[in-house]
A protein has these predicted regions:
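Active-site-proximal, structured, solvent-exposed surfaces of multi-pass membrane proteins
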Residues: 168-452
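Conserved luminal/periplasmic juxtamembrane motif of membrane-embedded glycan-processing enzymes
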Residues: 1-189, 201-205, 260-276, 287-320, ...
Length: 452
């Protein structure tokens, strides 16, 4: 990479579309539901149904989505994903009018640009497949690791694959992952207690320290399963203490809490020496509530050993968990796994409006996966013949590729567009016919009037 880089800070949702760059953020209620399903299956800490900002810096997921670059504010407490190497320090250009002038990002001037050494191409291939049913038996961090080894295919598609029957593709049911779950201890600070998988928080911003020994060269995850938050009006706990007070004092206290409502948003912060992450979930009666109860928080990669992390509870209340796990993911085999996926990949890629094309050459049957979200509007042509499009890894387009050299073309058309145009044309034609008939029957009151 050569030359100067600049970044325009107009921080807003859908910034990638606004600035005409490829990105991992979206805020659109009519967006691709498969992408949201993927984020949910990965238990990503995104907290709304129609909005997401990246993939929580999870290195494997970034590579699987062909992410090449990563931007970080210089000096920020931000753990850089594994495999991303700094290539440039860049400057911020003049900000846009709608930027938040009070934000730290607006006021910052220097950023570091990193390049992913393990980014996968737009089309890469698998030798192994795993059914969705077998895949769902693993937790979300294990699932992330499995995606580097086997393609996830819907159960009915696995049964119909001739490549599995003839031994060209291998169906796996039991996968060994590069993850471990170290033991941990929870040390409560002031204003919080922990008992039977439940945190009782008596004051805002109370903290616990989770002590655990983490190996070096690992990515550290916190897995919250069955997360539930409850709280009640503080007035309920003051009934006994109010009995000896005067009516005036009782009224003052009662008036203070009469309009009390539970928090709109529930905040948890996770901190290590090198990373800071925030998790937000919402009250059940709000439009932003997702119904999700499982969350994974990535505390980043570190080439040194770690001894633990802090959790800060932003709200008073009761936080119940079915299970809390600390999971570390090793990268000892990461490079080898990435190279296996890109060994046979799509080359000579051409991107035009609604069309993606490329070449692929393989000496055995492979499952080709595109880092493009699946949508029924896509059609696939291999050597000019229309072929079956599969949903792979819950979110991507895919297809079985037979041995040989092939030209692969993807074409997109908005689902229902053709029939919509036909129906619209018929409707307009019928409207004109009705208008002409009405005009002939009622010449004194024509619908279609000539210009005078």
């Amino acid at each position: 990479m050569k030359g100067e880089y600049s970044i325009k800070l107009g921080y807003c949702d859908n910034a990638s579309a606004l600035f005409d760059v490829n990105g991992l953020g979206s805020y659109w209620s009519l967006g691709n539901g498969n992408m949201q399903e993927f984020i949910t299956q990965m238990d990503n800490r995104e907290y709304m149904t129609v909005i997401y900002h990246g993939l929580d810096d999870r290195a494997s997921l970034l590579s699987l989505l062909s992410t090449k670059y990563y931007l970080s504010e210089k000096g920020s407490k931000q753990a850089i994903p594994y495999g991303f190497e700094k290539i440039k320090q860049i400057r911020k250009s003049a900000p846009y009018e709608y930027s938040d002038k009070n934000s730290r990002l607006y006021q910052s001037t220097k950023y570091n640009l990193y390049q992913n050494q393990y980014a996968l191409p737009l089309g890469y291939t698998y030798d192994n497949v795993i059914s969705r049913q077998s895949f769902d038996q693993y937790n979300s961090v294990e699932k992330e690791d499995i995606l580097l080894k086997s393609a996830v295919v819907e159960e009915e598609d696995v049964k119909d694959m001739d490549a599995i029957e003839n031994g060209q593709l291998i169906e796996t049911t039991d996968v060994t992952t590069n993850t471990e779950e170290p033991d941990y201890q929870i040390e409560c600070r002031e204003g919080i207690t922990f008992k039977e998988n439940t945190f009782y928080v008596k004051q805002p911003n109370a903290q616990v320290y989770v002590s655990c020994k983490n190996q070096k060269n690992t990515e550290l995850y916190v897995y919250l399963k069955g997360f539930q938050y409850t709280t009640s009006n503080p007035l309920n706990g003051l009934e006994n203490s109010m009995k000896g007070l005067s009516r005036l004092d009782q009224k003052i206290i009662t008036d203070k809490y009469k309009d009390w409502t539970s928090p709109y948003a529930i905040h948890l912060m996770f901190d290590t020496k090198t990373a800071h992450k925030r998790m937000i979930t919402y009250r059940e009666d709000t439009q932003l509530y997702t119904g999700r109860e499982n969350f994974v928080i990535n505390l980043g990669y570190d080439d040194k050993e770690r001894n633990g992390f802090y959790i800060t509870f932003g709200n008073e209340g009761i936080y119940h968990l079915d299970e809390l796990k600390v999971i570390e993911k090793s990268f000892n085999h990461y490079g080898e796994e990435i190279n296996n996926l890109k060994a046979v990949s799509l080359t000579d890629i051409s991107l035009t409006d609604n069309t993606v094309s490329g070449q692929i050459d393989t000496d055995k049957s492979k499952l080709l996966c595109f880092s493009i979200p699946y949508n029924r509007g896509w059609s696939l042509y291999i050597d000019g013949r229309k072929s079956e499009v599969l949903k792979v890894n819950m979110v991507f387009l895919g297809a079985v590729i037979e041995p040989g050299e092939h030209t692969v073309v993807l074409k997109y058309q908005t689902p229902g567009l053709k029939w919509g145009l036909i129906c619209s044309g018929i409707g307009i034609f019928m409207l004109l016919v009705i208008a002409l008939v009405f005009q002939r029957k009622n010449p004194q009151n024509p619908i279609l009037k000539k210009n005078t």
